[in-house]
Amino acid sequence: MDPLASNSPDTVVLAGGGTLGEAWMTGVAIGLKRGGGPDLTMAGQFIGTSAGSIMATMITGGTPLERRMQRLSGDSDIAGAEVDPTYTRIGREPGRVRRSAAGLAAMAGLALLGPGSRFIRRAFLRRIPEGRHDLGRLGESIDRLGLSWNGRLRITAVDLESADRVVFGNEFTDSVSVSDAVLASCAIPGYFRPVRGGGRTFVDGGVWSFSNLDLAGSGEGRTVICLNPAGTRVEGVPRLRAAITAGAIRLLSWLEAAKLRRDGTSVTVIRPNAEAAVAIGPSRMDSTRLEETVSAGIAQGLGLAESLGQRFSPA
């Protein structure tokens, strides 16, 4: 689909990265718009993975970014209904969820191995114990948006049995609701329960790739902006392994972007700058850092607004 405004990209890709990843991405989008840069909410298409699927759904469902910011930063009385039930539980089991997140990152890095990675990924998924928690309260929040598959929204997940990627919005539109697709995309293996739909079982889309940027579509003159909070060190993982995993995630994202660029697509990938990385801290699931992470994202977006605004200004 074409963008809905002349200063917006054709496609916005919103990657995984936990609750703080969503907070940072929301802040960046707000900062870009406030500073006169591209309006990400008016993109023609959104591709969301894990936390990015929440943000993509909120945007296409009509939730203003400023309102989402208030919910994430706790300034609204409904913040607890969407953030705390999930991430308060995570805070009580930091070791378990960080191990799950580290495993997720490792599986995403497997894509660098090529076609054989599918078999390794499937073996990994079969060895991971089924998660004990669910994201039902998040599903209720998505349901209240009343959103159907409208052509603008794509959400990624991975089939638990085959370890293949699925793209809701391209497939399963008759058998999987938008809310179930979001829950599937956020179902971190080993922590959250897998999500069933259309006769199949799904887990976090980040198992395949934290951004799934390659789905953005390519072609001469197309424009893509990817907000990617992933690729930083995960707390609780040995330093060397963490560095290797983070490097693999960044390399995979670079390869995905390079493929689009070879076909003539303009791709802009935005990652947390130094200040935002400090705000996010060592764990992307730390809900006590939401407000400062949103603020850091806004500041980063404001800093990028002028240069990106020139790139996306009407001819």
Residue ranges of model-derived segments:
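Patatin-like phospholipase
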Residues: 1-49, 54-315
